[in-house]
């Protein structure tokens, strides 16, 4: 219980807006409000994107993100069947967020691009059916085989 209290205290100390950027600094943005959810995605596409075992995604309201700079776009059909459009820096290639055009009210911010990364504490792990065997999800954190 003390660990949960510590996380809640840390999250309440975060001041919005939080600034973020791509690797080269061409794209800058501000997150104006707390995310709706923070998830760790273990799908193979996110493993390739992050070049790691999973990618951290913050589900945010679209109107809570203000972007400076011109983003490029890439599109694909996700394994879940959802449309997955990616916005990224055309210079360094760093992904900033994903979105589904059928759900324009929310976007999936690649939250490791934030300057203050204290919010990167996943509330759930998704696509664990594709998880790396060596990675152990912390006890008590909800997990889903695919997209909940």
Which residues fall in each region the model found?
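A short Gly-Trp-Pro
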Residues: 2-148
């Amino acid at each position: 219980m003390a660990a949960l209290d510590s996380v809640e205290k840390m999250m309440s100390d975060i001041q919005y807006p939080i600034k973020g950027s791509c690797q080269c600094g061409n794209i800058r943005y501000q997150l104006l409000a707390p995310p709706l959810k923070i998830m760790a995605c273990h799908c193979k596409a996110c493993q390739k994107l992050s070049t790691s075992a999973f990618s951290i995604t913050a589900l945010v309201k679209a109107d809570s993100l203000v972007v400076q700079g011109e983003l490029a776009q890439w599109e694909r059909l996700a394994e879940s069947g959802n449309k997955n459009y990616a916005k990224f820096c055309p210079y360094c290639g760093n992904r900033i967020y994903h979105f589904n055009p059928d759900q324009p009210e929310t976007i999936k911010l690649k939250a490791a691009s934030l300057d203050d990364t204290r919010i990167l504490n996943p509330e759930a792990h998704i696509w664990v059916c594709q998880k790396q065997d060596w990675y152990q999800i912390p006890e008590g954190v909800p997990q889903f085989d695919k997209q909940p």
